[in-house]
Regions:
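Conserved ATPase-coupling elements of RecA-like P-loop NTPase cores
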Residues: 18-25, 45-49, 70-73
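Signal for well-folded cores of large energy- and translation-related assemblies
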Residues: 2-5, 26, 51-52, 66, ...
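Switch II (G3) loop of P-loop NTPases
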Residues: 1-28, 36-40
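Structured C-terminal portions of repeat-based eukaryotic scaffold domains
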Residues: 29, 47-54
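NTP-binding/hydrolysis catalytic cores, primarily Walker-type P-loop NTPases
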Residues: 78-119
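Generic detector of bulky aromatic hydrophobic side chains
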Residues: 9, 22, 32, 57, ...
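Conserved beta-strand/loop subsegment of P-loop NTPase cores
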Residues: 32-38, 55-95
Length: 119
């Protein structure tokens, strides 16, 4: 990373299992901002693993977001942690603009998508 020290932004894509690499950067006193990227259809158990050990994230980004996909596990995680919601993408196409999102918007859209039935 020394050769990149003159850069304003360096993105490092790691899997959640590579926390040792991130910890080694912390030891080197490198200022890190960590952003969690999860799929819109991520399970609650998978999301909980990302927040184990009181991990702190600067923001949460949602990939594969669609207004028709139920994101209640994501909403639950955001409500239980103080991680701000950042942006979402609808597909892997880099030309597709990202969406700015707020937790309230996610809740409203998911409530509209719920199918209410009388029992």
């Amino acid at each position: 990373l020394q050769e990149l020290s003159n850069k304003k932004l360096v993105l490092i894509d790691t899997s959640g299992a590579e926390s040792l690499f991130v910890n080694s950067l912390k030891v080197q006193n490198i200022d890190l901002k960590k952003h969690l990227i999860i799929s819109a259809d991520c399970s609650e158990a998978a999301i909980a693993r990302y927040f184990e050990n009181n991990e702190t994230w600067n923001s949460l980004l949602i990939s594969k977001y669609s207004e028709t996909v139920s994101v209640w596990p994501v909403i639950n995680a955001l409500m239980n942690k103080s991680t701000p919601l950042s942006i979402a993408n609808e597909n892997a196409d880099l030309q597709t603009p990202l969406k700015n999102l707020k937790i309230r918007d996610l809740v409203v859209k998911n409530l509209k998508n719920m199918q209410l039935s009388l029992v």
